[in-house]
């Protein structure tokens, strides 16, 4: 049997961020439902499981000692402490999925994404934008869970966050979830065809073996 010129591609790490109300979660859910080769990265945390949460499904639940040990072993793409509990993205589990050819979505805040970018240089960083700030405002208001004070805080935060869009590889305007999903699918397809990704998967072949494969 003739050898393949290249191996099956390694999966792509897709890091998705954007302001609250931009529709990140809805887009990620649609991608997961539509594609069986796209998986969500499961975060690790030291907080106690809530009712109905399953270890390895909702989170990887760790003790603080276990979490700190993994920090020492450099096994997090990013991590942070929030209200006394640690949260992080396990590097080993993400790498395992990528090596298996799975595409991995990491939906994360901007600060976390920038930390991931320092370690995962081959990641694809996508910023989700609302069609307009007025539309973003209406989406947040429709949730019905915000006070006037918290609304103002969210709007100010959104303005600040949008300024980070230049740190990302791609920007996708979410005026329609279906269209936004199609744009991300196109980005993923293009990324898989990048020469630098293919080069990493090329088999080491002697010149005469390559000649035989191409011209026999």
Swiss-Prot record:
Catalytic activity field: GMP + ATP = GDP + ADP
E.C. numbers: 2.7.4.8
GO CC field: cytosol
Major location (coarse): cytoplasm
Keywords from the UniProt entry: ATP-binding, Cytoplasm, Kinase, Nucleotide-binding, Transferase
NCBIfam families in the record: guanyl_kin (TIGR03263)
Primary role: Essential for recycling GMP and indirectly, cGMP.
Name of the protein in question: Guanylate kinase
């Amino acid at each position: 049997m003739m050898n393949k010129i290249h191996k099956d591609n390694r999966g792509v790490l897709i890091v998705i961020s954007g302001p609250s109300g931009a529709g990140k979660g809805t887009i990620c859910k649609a991608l997961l439902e539509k594609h069986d080769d796209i998986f969500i990265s499961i975060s690790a945390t030291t907080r106690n499981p809530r009712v109905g949460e399953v270890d390895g499904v909702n989170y990887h639940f760790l003790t603080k000692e276990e979490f700190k040990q993994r920090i020492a072993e450099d096994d997090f793409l990013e991590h942070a402490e929030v209200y006394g509990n640690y949260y992080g993205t396990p590097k080993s589990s993400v790498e395992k999925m990528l090596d298996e050819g799975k595409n991995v979505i990491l939906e994360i805040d901007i600060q976390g994404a920038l930390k991931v970018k320092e370690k995962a240089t081959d990641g694809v960083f996508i910023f989700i934008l609302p069609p307009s700030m007025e539309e973003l405002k209406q989406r947040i208001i429709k949730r019905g869970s915000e006070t006037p004070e918290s609304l103002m805080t969210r709007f100010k935060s959104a303005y600040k966050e949008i300024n980070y869009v230049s740190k990302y590889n791609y920007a996708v305007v979410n005026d329609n979830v279906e269209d936004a999903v199609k744009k991300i699918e196109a980005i993923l397809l293009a990324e898989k065809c990048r020469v630098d990704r293919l080069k990493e998967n090329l088999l080491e072949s002697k010149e005469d073996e390559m000649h035989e494969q191409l011209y026999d």
